Structure formats: C-alpha cells, structure tokens
C-alpha cells in the first residue's frame, strides 16, 4: 500500500495513527479486526511491540551498537521474532554484521533499519519516505526488499511518499490532500519495482 501526497498533506500523521504513535480525535481505525482507536496506553504499547515495524526516513540507529546489535535490541521486546542475523543476511548485510552505523553507507543503514523492522515479525510495516535520503539505485533496492516482504512473507507494507511513481508498485493507493483522504484506489496489477522509473 502506498500513501501518496505532497509535503504537509498529512501522510506522516496518518502513518503515526496507523502505528499507534498518535491518537485519533475522531473516527475509528480498524486494523486486522481491531479498533486501535479504542486501545488504552498499555494496549497501544503492546500493539506497537507485537504488530508494527517502523522504517523511518532517517534510520534512528544506535551509533554505539553494531548492525547486528541494532537489530537484536529491537527483538528483545518481541515474543515471536525472527533471527536477527538471518534477517540481516536476507537484506544483503551478511558481511556487515559487526560494523557500526558510521561504517555503513546510507543504503546499508537503511537496510539495517528495515532488518530491525522485519526481525520483529510484525503484521504491519510502516515506512515513512524510506528512500527519501537515498540515491536512485539504492532506493530501488530498498523498495524491492519491501515489495518482496509484502509478496513473499504476506506482510502489510505501507509506504508513505510524495513520489507519485511509486503508486504503480502498490495494490492500494491512498491519496492525501490537506489532511484528508482524497481517494482510495485499487491496483489489480501492481508493477514490480524494477519496472518503475522516476
């Protein structure tokens, strides 16, 4: 799923609502049969821990921890997590496990952030402009990882972006304008990331 809109349209706010980071003042948000707007603080914390993985534009890695340790620390709060080393290898970082963030490129740091989100084994992965700070080639690699995650592991991946070209990779596109959902479109034939140009 892609949430599309201009800067300041409300995309990140919607993402934060879906992730239980903000609370709605009106209406309901139903995910997987649960109305998360009715959750108390403990339920929201449990929801964020168990059901949601976050990938932000800026990676929020712990600078004094290695790539492996950055993923391991995230899974300490999860019951049904995946093996951190296996996940890092799956995103192409098997030879960078013991490197600190300062020793990694921007694309490698973003892959650590994605591995951290994947390793929690959440139902929902929320990505806020995951390619915004990356070059074209690295951005496509990151999007491919996310698309494969959705297709192969049956996870709901939500990508927030202002890049209209990315709508072609999604099965559902939500367009946001001035803090409101302008439209919800279904794409019966999403393209693979390799076919998309911007």
Model-predicted segments: where are they?
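ABC family nucleotide-binding domain
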Residues: 1-176
